[in-house]
């Protein structure tokens, strides 16, 4: 990640920046934001867990009973791409609004709107309306500001040298939600446990969790961007900055390699549940257990393993091998046709991609000057969310041919991109200006 070393950011520089002393107080001040991230991702994790078996097996008659499977997986891919598509469009605007009006007002409005969207999702499932479900998913993504607010607030009160650790807590909160959300949500959607449980029940529960989180945030969270530090912003600038992905010749290849890695990784998250439902005929309760299991190595990586590897290997090496292994393990998932093997193959795939995700961003950050960090990493985040949205559509279209195809294609994409990093980008390219990628 960014390793800014500006003057005045040491122990004495904190006072010059108007920042509080480092220590437990900083974490306590930001704790409500981590709770918001956790609650938001609990809700988001339910979409993959519930929507996949629901659409493919038509448990709730959301689609016509005679709808062919090829059309079902395409519609599922479209449905799963809508939330990140909303994020792609909404996050830059919400981030700009929080710069202008403060973090807390934007976060509170976002939370209220998102809470309402989850109620709308539950209503759509109860009414068996695919159109309303799709609209609510898109609106929820547009309103989602938890990660952008958390990152901005951390930048407000934490020095650059300390930010990696505090940003890491964001990913730890999100990955923990991917364990809790599917496990609890899968059971709440199982009518065999309680007769009145159904696909809408987890989203009503998510709405209640978000409502309580909203109330707690309003009471506890203190503004980190006071009026004296706010500034007017250009909303169009957030989008025109993306031109750098094409125009920046020095970073262009790294941008597009990262996009390929992100497309493969987020495509995996959307496509392996399709494979489980089609191949092993799993219901929502069983799917939820595998989705939660995939989250376990991500938590381990964020909590410890990535840091352990980072001090022993170069960023380039970590990116290359983790991406290659991610692709190889994806193909192994569909190559071994036993349900018991999934506990191993899914774990290995998730472990590899959990290392690859932060390594991609770090590799790009180290190739960037300090003055460009914000713009370049913003572009990278936009590429990540864009790839996440596209992956659902690509996965659905490929699965319409046969359900194993998306994981095979995405696996080959990750492996090819890793080889391009190895042989297509010179070892003497900048890691930071004037430094080799291999020198870190």
Regions found by a protein language model. Give the residues of each.
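C-terminal ends and interior cores of transmembrane alpha-helices
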Residues: 112-127, 324-337
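Cytoplasmic helix-loop-helix junction between adjacent transmembrane helices
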Residues: 136-174
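C-terminal transmembrane helical hairpin of 12-TM major facilitator-type secondary transporters
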Residues: 316-360
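Juxtamembrane intracellular "pre-TM" segments in multi-pass secondary transporters
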Residues: 13-27, 222-256, 440
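A late C-terminal transmembrane helix in Major Facilitator Superfamily
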Residues: 372-401
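Helix-to-loop junctions at the C-terminal end of transmembrane segments
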Residues: 89-102, 301-315, 399
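Hydrophobic core of transmembrane alpha-helices in multi-pass small-molecule transporters
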Residues: 38, 117, 130-145, 341-355
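Short amphipathic helix-loop junctions that connect adjacent transmembrane helices
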Residues: 50-73, 270-286
């Amino acid at each position: 990640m960014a390793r800014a070393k500006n003057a005045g950011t040491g122990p004495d520089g904190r006072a010059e920046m108007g920042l509080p002393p480092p220590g437990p107080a900083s974490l306590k001040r930001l704790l409500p934001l981590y709770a918001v991230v956790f609650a938001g991702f609990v809700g988001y994790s339910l979409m993959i867990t519930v929507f996949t078996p629901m659409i493919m097996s038509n448990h709730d008659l959301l689609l016509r009973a005679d709808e062919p499977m090829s059309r079902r997986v395409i519609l599922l891919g479209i449905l799963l791409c809508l939330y990140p598509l909303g994020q792609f469009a909404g996050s830059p605007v919400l981030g700009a609004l929080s710069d202008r009006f403060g973090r807390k007002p934007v976060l509170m409005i976002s939370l209220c709107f998102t809470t309402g969207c989850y109620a709308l999702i539950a209503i759509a499932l109860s009414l068996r309306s695919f159109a309303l479900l799709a609209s609510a998913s898109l609106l929820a993504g547009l309103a989602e500001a938890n990660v952008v607010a958390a990152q901005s607030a951390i930048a407000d009160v934490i020095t650059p040298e300390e930010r990696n650790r505090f940003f890491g807590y964001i990913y730890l909160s999100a990955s923990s939600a991917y364990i809790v959300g599917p496990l609890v949500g899968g059971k709440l959607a199982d009518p065999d446990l309680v007769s009145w449980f159904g696909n809408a029940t987890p989203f009503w529960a998510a709405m209640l969790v978000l409502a309580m989180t909203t109330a707690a945030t309003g009471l506890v969270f203190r503004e980190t961007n006071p009026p004296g530090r706010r500034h007017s912003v250009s909303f169009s600038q957030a989008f025109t900055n993306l031109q750098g992905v094409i125009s920046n010749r020095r970073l262009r290849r790294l941008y597009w390699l990262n996009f390929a890695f992100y497309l493969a990784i987020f495509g995996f998250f959307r496509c392996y549940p399709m494979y489980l439902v089609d191949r092993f005929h799993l219901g929502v309760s069983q799917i939820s257990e595998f989705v939660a299991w995939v989250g376990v190595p991500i938590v381990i990586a964020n909590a410890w393993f990535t840091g352990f590897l980072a001090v022993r290997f170069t960023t380039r090496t970590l990116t290359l091998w983790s991406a290659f292994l991610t692709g190889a393990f994806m193909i192994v998932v569909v190559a071994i046709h036993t349900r018991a093997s999934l506990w191993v193959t899914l774990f290995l795939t998730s472990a590899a991609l959990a290392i690859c995700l932060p390594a991609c961003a770090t590799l790009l950050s180290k190739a960037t000057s300090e003055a460009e960090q914000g713009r370049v990493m913003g572009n990278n985040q936009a590429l990540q969310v864009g790839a996440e949205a596209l992956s659902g559509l690509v996965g659905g279209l490929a699965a319409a041919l046969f359900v194993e195809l998306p994981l095979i294609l995405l696996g080959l994409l990750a492996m090819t991109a890793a080889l391009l990093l190895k042989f297509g980008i010179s070892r003497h390219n900048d890691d930071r200006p004037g430094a080799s990628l291999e020198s870190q």
